[in-house]
């Protein structure tokens, strides 16, 4: 089953530990530091739109893009006034209606880019849609996080009407992290009214209640900081900064998530103000 298909139904419930407000305040501070106090922004890999809505609340006009239509459907459920434009797009095929002041991507969405060439492609796409001097702020999980924190662990998260088992496996040579999600979702809860494929779903009885079991496989890639810097250069962008998410200092061997700030740079043939 494709990543973020069934998981989209319970994503916000199980990701309630993500510090979106803290991240949002920090990103807003960066935007203002670079002179971006208003205007149109785009979030890549916006998921259910939590960060998109936060930035909209800070006075920015927002576009959210995501490869998962199921995640976007959830995002649209939260959107009551229709001010946010959500687009179902693979970030490697980013296509906007014009330029934006800045692009952001959080919650390790960029780790879903599985090859160096695709990383360069995404950066080129972003550069093409940034206004002159615009910035791209994104985070990435580190090699240390995948190899030493998650590694080959198994994690279980049990909630009132659903449970998830995360089975992790990190491939050292390729630096690819694979994880399989096994989800048990109560069928008598109207919040989880989803169609399912009989080949992907199994019924289970627990404490007299009927649960449906689903599986999804996800893969992410860990990059070195030097690889990202090189990709930024190869994409024709300008590298500005990288720092640890928690300390806001230069990353070290214990950093689990890092932020990158890169800036738009002129490309021959680029069409500004589309």
Where are these regions (language model features)?
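SAM-dependent methyltransferase
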Residues: 137-231
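Residues lining the SAM
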Residues: 106-108
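Class I SAM-dependent methyltransferase SAM/SAH-binding core
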Residues: 42, 49-93
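Conserved class I S-adenosyl-L-methionine
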Residues: 1-37
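A short glycine-rich, Lys/Arg-flanked "PGG" loop and its adjoining helix->strand segment in the class I
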Residues: 120-132
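C-terminal lobe and adjacent flexible extensions of AdoMet/dcAdoMet transferase-like proteins
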Residues: 219-274
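A short acidic, Gly/Pro-enriched loop at the edge of an enzyme's catalytic core
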Residues: 95-102
């Amino acid at each position: 089953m494709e990543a973020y298909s069934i998981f989209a139904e319970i994503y916000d419930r199980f990701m309630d530990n993500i510090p979106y407000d803290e991240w949002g305040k920090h990103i807003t501070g960066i935007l203002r530091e670079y002179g971006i106090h208003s205007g149109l922004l785009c979030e890549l890999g916006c998921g259910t739109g939590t960060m998109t809505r936060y930035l909209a609340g800070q006075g920015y006009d927002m576009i959210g893009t995501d490869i998962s239509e199921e995640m976007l459907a959830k995002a649209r459920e939260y959107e009551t006034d229709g001010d946010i434009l959500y687009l179902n797009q693979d970030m490697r095929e980013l296509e906007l209606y014009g330029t934006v002041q800045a692009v952001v991507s959080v919650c390790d969405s960029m780790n879903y880019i599985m090859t160096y060439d695709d990383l360069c492609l995404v950066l080129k796409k972003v550069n093409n849609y940034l206004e002159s001097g615009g910035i791209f702020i994104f985070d990435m999980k580190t090699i240390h996080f995948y190899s030493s924190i998650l590694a080959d662990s198994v994690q279980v998260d049990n909630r009132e009407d659903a449970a998830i088992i995360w089975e992790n496996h990190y491939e050292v040579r390729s630096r690819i992290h694979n994880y399989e999600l096994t989800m048990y979702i109560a069928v008598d809860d109207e919040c989880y009214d989803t169609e399912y494929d009989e080949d992907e779903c199994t019924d289970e009885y627990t404490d007299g209640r009927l649960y449906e079991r689903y599986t999804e496989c996800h893969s992410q890639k860990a990059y070195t900081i030097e690889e990202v810097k090189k990709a930024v250069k190869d994409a024709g962008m300008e590298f500005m900064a990288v720092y640890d998410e928690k300390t806001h200092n230069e990353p070290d061997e214990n950093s689990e998530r890092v932020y990158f700030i890169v800036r738009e740079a002129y490309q021959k043939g680029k069409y500004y103000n589309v």
